[in-house]
Regions:
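Active-site loop-to-helix "anion-binding N-cap" substructures in soluble metabolic enzymes
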Residues: 1-211, 215-230, 237, 242-252, ...
Length: 312
């Protein structure tokens, strides 16, 4: 393991590469990455890096976002099969048709989408900035929000809007069991529930804190004295435990106890071995059709500009 990590670091230096890791990656990848963060942070780092090569340890759409923002850089992913159930729930042709059927609507897309979906979007959001970006539009603005219906419903509730929602969802966040969380709360009455807004509303009603992975991490760091039940992909527990070694974090259980459904199987496809091979061979490489990229970059840049103004 140590030899492999050493070899990766040597290749990284030799090729002037940067490794970006999402909070849902395996712990050893998070520890090796130059920067670890949520989707917004990864996009921000990609946009300003001076590295020649960006290795995106996350899922495919994150690599696409980096490539759209940095068309002249080489963007690699350790495993091209690392997709996203949420992005897959929103095929670009179907979403484009949906937009066409609703003229006069502003289109807001969650970052968990393909570049082709972003290309028919007015502004992109992440779970960190979705509320603030939606609130930046007039109250009577007609908005299409996609693809996550759970996040859309949550944003509708906290902004008092009635956005038109695409019917997509993340398979991990859909799986959390209300009954089992209630049971855990009974066993640990002092525990606070931290939940990601991609969870169903029935889970969010049990939550003491609802927020993006970065927001949930920040809350735990600021209140390390609490015990937490964490309803998001379990990879975040690595960083939480690292930052708060004395704190007890309990992963919220899924409905199906026979599977590791609170883990994203796509995120887990990335390994140190694949990361080494990816850097060594400079492959697999993310490519985005230049015409699609030209359209997709505008809503992403708009998100980054609004986020910068809001201090996010």
């Amino acid at each position: 393991m140590n030899e492999l990590i050493k070899a990766i670091n040597e290749l990284k230096k030799e090729k002037n590469a940067i490794i970006l890791g999402h909070y849902y990656q395996k712990g050893e990848i998070q520890d090796l990455a130059d920067y670890v963060g949520d989707s917004l942070a990864l996009a921000q780092w990609a946009a300003k890096t001076e590295a020649d090569i960006i290795v995106m340890c996350g899922v495919h759409f994150m690599g696409e976002t980096a490539k759209v923002l940095c068309p002249d850089k080489k963007v690699l992913v350790p495993d091209m099969a690392a997709g996203c159930s949420l992005a897959d729930s929103c095929p670009a042709d179907q979403f484009a048709q949906f937009v066409k059927e609703h003229p006069g609507y502003t289109v807001i897309s969650y970052v968990n989408t393909t570049a082709a979906v972003k290309a028919v979007t007015d502004v992109v959001v992440t779970s960190t900035n979705a509320k603030q970006i939606v609130e930046s539009f007039p109250k009577d603005e007609k908005i299409i929000f996609g693809p996550d219906r759970n996040l859309g419903n949550y944003i509708n509730s906290v902004t008092n809007r009635n956005m038109l929602l695409w019917d997509g969802a993340c398979h991990v966040h859909e799986q959390f069991s209300v009954e089992k969380i209630v049971e855990l709360k009974t066993q640990h009455p002092e525990a606070l529930v931290l939940a990601h807004p991609e969870c169903k509303s029935t889970v969010l009603k049990l939550a003491d804190v609802v927020g993006s992975t970065a927001a949930l991490l920040k809350y735990a760091v600021n209140h390390p004295e609490n015990t937490y039940i964490v309803a998001t992909e379990s990879g975040i527990l690595h960083e939480m435990q690292k930052k708060c070694p004395q704190t007890t974090f309990i992963p919220a259980p899924p409905n199906d106890s026979t599977c590791g459904c609170n883990e994203c199987s796509f995120m887990r496809l990335n390994t140190l071995e694949k990361l080494y091979e990816c850097l060594k061979n400079e492959s697999p490489e993310i490519t985005v059709d230049p015409e699609v990229a030209k359209k997709a970059v505008k809503p992403i840049q708009r998100m980054l500009e609004i986020s910068a103004k809001l201090g996010l």
